[in-house]
Amino acid sequence: MVKAYKQAGVDIEAGYQAVALMKQHVQKTMRPEVLGGIGGFGGLFDLSSLDYRQPVLVSGTDGVGTKLKLAFLLDRHNTIGIDCVAMCVNDIVVQGAEPLFFLDYIACGKAVPEKIAAIVKGVADGCVEAGCALIGGETAEMPGMYAEDEYDLAGFVVGIAEKERLVTGQTIQAGDVLIGLPSSGLHSNGYSLVRRIIFEQAKLSLDEIYEPLDVPLGEELLKPTRIYAKLLRSVLGRFTIKGMAHITGGGFIENIPRMLPQGLGVRIQRGSWPVLPIFDFLRAKGNLEEEEMFSVFNMGIGLVLAVSPETAAPLVQWLDEQNEPAYIIGEVVEGAGVSFTGGNEA
């Protein structure tokens, strides 16, 4: 029967080998609360030792999107898992949660053990960076659904927060200040547009270094998404943060309003932070308008915090002392949506 299954395109032995190879990576993510190891029907996590009066579990799920296509083209698979963790974890930490555990899902056309292990290594590296345990996952070999050299990657994270310390945005008011934390690059959104610009419009090579970039284009595009979990935990332990927005799909235009109460908008100050060269490069090659850039990309800001005016300067100063750049990028105003003021167009 196993032989027949292999002839149908599913190699069970390859799956076993992949699990054996990934165990070393999974092990480094373990926390004391994890019960048992991988391989069970479900992952176990003991909450009893955590010191919360009114604990609230906060969950998130996401994938990497078409950034995967570039990993396929470059045959580089050891960092794409970091992106998967980041996309999930950043969504829950902006609500004040501490990530506890993570699960991944890999669907592929052909299970190549070394490739699967490389993907999981990235997931494990992301979990270590976020402080959460990788307690389970699924690798599904699906011939006929995916090409042999392609796969999809998704993840699921659960975190915890004290109910009274959830960051909900409800206390945000006009006059509050917006602080931006830098991104590492494109992060994990906008890649369908990126691929269209690079391959169809500009017909560029992933192996070439183009001005103003300082690394090959492919390397720039595969830079892992920044994970903000540990930094935000330190921030939340010292400062009152009224609201936070993870700048992902939809850019500034869609994501910043998600943290605002009804009747409020934001005014962004152009030129108040350094826009990374990759964004200027893509805008020029794709002939894109400012509004579209801010509707698709993070433009060099991966996370936005809303704080009271008296908190803004001390927070930026403290972050600077931690060698963590931060920028006052705008303010909350009466109205709705996102507007821009000052300087030249980004």
Swiss-Prot record:
This is Phosphoribosylformylglycinamidine cyclo-ligase. The keyword Cytoplasm applies. The lineage of its organism: Bacteria, Bacillati, Bacillota, Bacilli, Bacillales. GO terms for molecular function: ATP binding; phosphoribosylamine-glycine ligase activity; phosphoribosylformylglycinamidine cyclo-ligase activity. It catalyses: 2-formamido-N(1)-(5-O-phospho-beta-D-ribosyl)acetamidine + ATP = 5-amino-1-(5-phospho-beta-D-ribosyl)imidazole + ADP + phosphate + H(+). It holds the Pfam family AIRS. InterPro entries: PurM-like_C_dom, PurM-like_C_sf, PurM-like_N, PurM-like_N_sf, PurM_cligase. HAMAP family: AIRS. Keywords: ATP-binding, Cytoplasm, Ligase, Nucleotide-binding, Purine biosynthesis. GO terms for biological process: 'de novo' IMP biosynthetic process; adenine biosynthetic process. One of its GO terms (cellular component) is cytosol. Belongs to the AIR synthase family. Pathway: Purine metabolism; IMP biosynthesis via de novo pathway; 5-amino-1-(5-phospho-D-ribosyl)imidazole from N(2)-formyl-N(1)-(5-phospho-D-ribosyl)glycinamide: step 2/2. Gene3D superfamilies: PurM-like C-terminal domain, PurM-like, N-terminal domain. It comes from the Bacteria. Its EC number is 6.3.3.1. The keyword Nucleotide-binding applies. Signal peptide: none annotated. It is found in: Cytoplasm. CDD domains: PurM.
